[in-house]
Amino acid sequence: MKNKEHFDRTLKILVNAYLNNSLVQGNCHACAVGNMIAASLDIKYDQDLKWIGRPVAWSQVFVTLNYKIAQVKRPWAYTGEAREQINSTGYSWQELARMEYAFERAPRGKTKEEHMFNGLMAVVEVLSQIHEMDEKTKVAAKELFFKI
């Protein structure tokens, strides 16, 4: 496995966000990437799950819109605040774009909760490729998201 500590840290952020209900598809502040950046930069959330005191800049580089199938990518916007936010995660903007697309484009399911869970499973699939995880590690990672 490539960079286990980085993988474990990312997984912990996503599990905590999911179990604490601070993970929201379609919200750049609180999606999978938004949570990773917020945790990395110690950004707090308000009651509407918006960042306090920081603008969302990373979505100027890439974003997956609900009404479009293709992801919008603007690599020329990878500067300033957007660069700082993306770099804080330890992933490249291309890797984060893959995670974000997987999260937002996951199968809907019957409920919002099921859609969120499907999104997280899709992110774990992307992380397993980035970190070159074996099947056993991937299955164990997915099991962390089961709510009791």
Question: Where are the predicted features?
Answer:
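Domain-length accessory/inserted modules outside core catalytic folds
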Residues: M1-A30, I37-I148
